[in-house]
């Protein structure tokens, strides 16, 4: 039962984290610089 809960938690966490990296990360200069998905260097 605990394995199932962990898997479900991981699945639910993955989507918001991915969205946060795409949106929020690109708003932070340090993360923006390291993330090519944000559009590369300015």
Swiss-Prot record:
Keywords tagged on the record: Acetylcholine receptor inhibiting toxin, Amidation, Disulfide bond, Neurotoxin, Postsynaptic neurotoxin, Secreted, Toxin
Signal peptide: none
PTM-bearing positions, type Glycine amide: 39
Pfam family, one: Toxin_8
Superkingdom of origin organism: Eukaryota
Record-annotated disulphide pairs: 25-31, 26-38
Name of the molecule in the record: Alpha-conotoxin VnIB
Organism, scientific name: Conus ventricosus (Mediterranean cone)
């Amino acid at each position: 039962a605990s394995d199932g809960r962990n898997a479900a938690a991981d699945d639910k966490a993955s989507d918001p984290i991915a969205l946060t990296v795409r949106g929020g990360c690109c708003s932070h200069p340090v993360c923006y610089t390291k993330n090519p998905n944000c559009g590369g260097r300015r």
